């Protein structure tokens, strides 16, 4: 618990990224540069170079463990932060995790704000890459 709370301020947004992809890495760096927040990345493996990142904390969930373990890990993570005044922002960073989130959205929405497709594209590629009508809508 202390490991998580040291980097989280009351009232802050906590990005929770699913999958270690180039989009996840760029999203974590962008969130850190723009807002000063550390992203929590749930993934199946952690490359050595990524372990040195100052803007990401990793939670390793073996891919062979299946969906239920990932959902349980997310639930436990949210429960650890349950009494804090935080917004847990769940961002799936590949198609597999996007499908997982959509399939279990009802359960996950109790604890997380879930990015929709337009939000994911803005977060992954930056607001400047999204069409103007989507950004201003």
Language-model segment annotations:
Residues 2-20:
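Nucleotide-activated donor-dependent transferases that construct or modify glycoconjugates
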Residues 6-12, 33, 81-85:
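Flexible, charged surface loops at secondary-structure boundaries
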Residues 51-137:
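Conserved N-proximal alpha/beta basic substrate-recognition cap immediately N-terminal to
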Residues 42-49:
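Short, polar loop motifs at secondary-structure junctions
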Residues 14, 37-40, 87:
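Residues at the starts of beta-strands that form the adenosine-phosphate
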Residues 15-31:
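Glycine-rich adenosine-cofactor-binding loop
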Residues 35-39, 112-114:
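A generic structural motif
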